[in-house]
């Protein structure tokens, strides 16, 4: 978790991890800070724009989750761990929330428009079919034309990869392809 400044050689480690959580406004990641960039290139840039949570969640795709504060960050980490096994020998935890796996999702009849040229929100489909309509986005702000998220069906953890018709008509590009590959 990146909750404060992380610069120089220390920033290599997070980039090699499976999941990076970054706190908005306080978490920063960059090889070289704004002062060095200014002295070398003459360009003035602030630390937030250079390596802040918004930059790494929306633009570079280096971070996978953005938290509003340290407490939110820890809570998001706990939530992610609830979807994952403790090690490669274990299965992911099964967590039942009382959602009937045999329920009918009537809203699926109206989510996808009759006109094939109209976009729809794939998140509406995900909410309709997952336990309690709950899911956890992975890289949710990056490459929005591809959805990657964790969810549950009948209490069992699953990963979902889906094109998002509301963003670029769901067309694939290099960024969303990279996002899906990292998720897999």
Where are these regions (language model features)?
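Short, exposed beta-strand "edge-strand" segments with a Pro/Gly-rich flavor and a Y/T-containing core
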Residues: 39-44, 61-68, 111-120, 165-172
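Short hydrophobic/aromatic-rich motifs at helix boundaries and adjacent loops
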Residues: 25-26, 97-98, 155
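Non-catalytic terminal/interface segments that mediate subunit docking, oligomerization
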Residues: 118-184
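Short acidic (Asp/Glu) and glycine-rich catalytic loops that position anionic groups and cofactors
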Residues: 33-34, 54-61, 100-108, 159-164
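Terminal amphipathic helices with adjacent charged low-complexity linkers/tails
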Residues: 65-126
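Conserved catalytic cores of soluble enzyme domains
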Residues: 1-89
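Short capping/connector residues at structural and topological boundaries
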Residues: 34-36, 41-45, 50, 55, ...
């Amino acid at each position: 978790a990146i909750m404060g400044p992380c610069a120089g050689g220390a920033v290599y480690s997070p980039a090699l991890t499976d999941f990076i959580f970054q706190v908005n406004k306080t978490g920063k990641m960059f090889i070289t800070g704004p002062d060095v960039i200014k002295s070398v290139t003459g360009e003035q840039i602030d630390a937030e724009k250079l390596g802040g949570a918004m930059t790494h969640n929306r633009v570079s795709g280096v971070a996978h989750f953005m938290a509003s504060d340290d407490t939110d960050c820890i809570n998001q980490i706990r939530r992610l761990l609830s979807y994952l096994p403790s090690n490669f020998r274990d299965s992911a935890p099964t967590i039942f929330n009382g959602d009937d796996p045999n329920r009918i999702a009537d809203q699926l009849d109206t989510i996808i428009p009759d006109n094939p040229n109209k976009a729809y929100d794939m998140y509406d489909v995900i909410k309709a079919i997952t336990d309690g309509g709950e899911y956890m986005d992975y890289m949710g702000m990056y490459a929005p034309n591809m959805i990657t998220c964790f969810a549950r069906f009948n209490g069992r953890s699953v990963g979902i990869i889906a094109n998002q018709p509301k963003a670029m008509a769901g067309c694939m590009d290099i960024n969303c392809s990279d996002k899906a590959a990292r998720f897999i």
